[in-house]
Curated annotation (Swiss-Prot):
It is a peripheral membrane protein. It comes from Oryctolagus cuniculus (Rabbit). GO terms for biological process: lactate metabolic process. PANTHER family: L-2-HYDROXYCARBOXYLATE DEHYDROGENASE (NAD(P)(+)) (PTHR43128), L-LACTATE DEHYDROGENASE B CHAIN (PTHR43128:SF2). It is found in: Cytoplasm; Mitochondrion inner membrane. Pathway: Fermentation; pyruvate fermentation to lactate; (S)-lactate from pyruvate: step 1/1. This is L-lactate dehydrogenase B chain. Belongs to the LDH/MDH superfamily. LDH family.
Amino acid sequence: GKFIIPQIVKYSPNCIIIVVSNPVDILTYVTWKLSGLPKHRVIGSGCNLDSARFRYLMAEKLGIHPSSCHGWILGEHGDSRLAVWSGVNVAGVSLQELNPEMGTDNDSENWKEVHKMVVESAYEVIKLKGYTNWAIGLSVADLIESMLKNLSRIHPVSTMVRGMYGIESEVFLSLPCILNARGLTSVINQKLKDDEVAQLKKSADTLWDIQKDLKDL
């Protein structure tokens, strides 16, 4: 990366870089530092695939098409990734309002299992009835399409989050971001519950603990 990234920027100064390699949040930070590019032009694939899988599993559980199921996996692309239960909805109906225990150990509908499957399936491609596999290649093509076609679609991708949700360090985490021809143009400030914010901060601390020891950036 140390040799490749400066070369990319030298020959393509107006580029937008999408980082896909794991650990994606840390490598996106490293790429941002090495490239000298503004933060809206360095993006990590982050939780885009996790969120797609979450919606497919949610769809299977509810018997509703994935495109009509809304839910986000945010934070670190790792075991501490966060399912935003407070935002899960179908046609604007909040599932957490219908089932206040959603995602907890006391949840009779066992939504926690869906989150667990997302975490576990990150290491294998899920095959679900009637849908193509949302493998990482398709997921990245999805991000690129939003930029090439200037769609301004919202994706949960890894971006520099300092100043958001009380995070003070220069870390990259997945939040809902608008992607278009200019790159990552804005971050949607989702109304998260206190426990969700605490989890994001914990992810940020974990990442910073690793990053602060990275030399020569």
